[in-house]
Amino acid sequence: MSRALIKFIRLSPTKARLIAREVQGMNAELALASLKFMPNKGAKFIANAISSAVANGGFEANEVIVSSCRVDAGAVLKRFRPRARGSASRIRKPTSHILVEVSKAEVSAEKTTKAKKASVKKES
């Protein structure tokens, strides 16, 4: 298992989590292909984290799955916008930390035995 962490992304964590949920559990190659065509800003950052995690482990993208994709809230940048009559309102610019873990795609023993039993039933 290998991981990659990208910190202080200028993107709201709630928006990034929508994309992170989509790719969790997918094959890394399939996840990168689907992220490439997503119009969201966070898709580029999550794709970067996935490819970095794959490279950190020394794997190929087609032999690993995205086992975990977590988005945490980072520091919030606070800015002020001038308003009427000398007042000001606060602008919050949230940041995110993206953690991606990839692991080898292994077929479990249960799945193979179920597949064998199903093929035996079809033959008889």
Swiss-Prot record:
Please state the span of the N-terminal signal peptide per the UniProt entry: none
Query: From the Swiss-Prot or TrEMBL record, what is one GO molecular function term?
Result: structural constituent of ribosome
Residue ranges annotated as coiled coil are none
What's a single GO CC term here? cytosolic large ribosomal subunit
Alphabetized, the UniProt keywords read: Ribonucleoprotein, Ribosomal protein, RNA-binding, rRNA-binding
GO BP terms: namely:
translation
- Annotated HAMAP family: Ribosomal_uL22_B (MF_01331_B)
Family, according to the entry, reads as follows: Belongs to the universal ribosomal protein uL22 family.
**Stated role:** This protein binds specifically to 23S rRNA; its binding is stimulated by other ribosomal proteins, e.g. L4, L17, and L20. It is important during the early stages of 50S assembly. It makes multiple contacts with different domains of the 23S rRNA in the assembled 50S subunit and ribosome. The globular domain of the protein is located near the polypeptide exit tunnel on the outside of the subunit, while an extended beta-hairpin is found that lines the wall of the exit tunnel in the center of the 70S ribosome.
**How does this polypeptide assemble, per the annotation?**
Part of the 50S ribosomal subunit.
This one is known as Large ribosomal subunit protein uL22
Q: Which species is the source of this protein?
A: Campylobacter lari (strain RM2100 / D67 / ATCC BAA-1060)
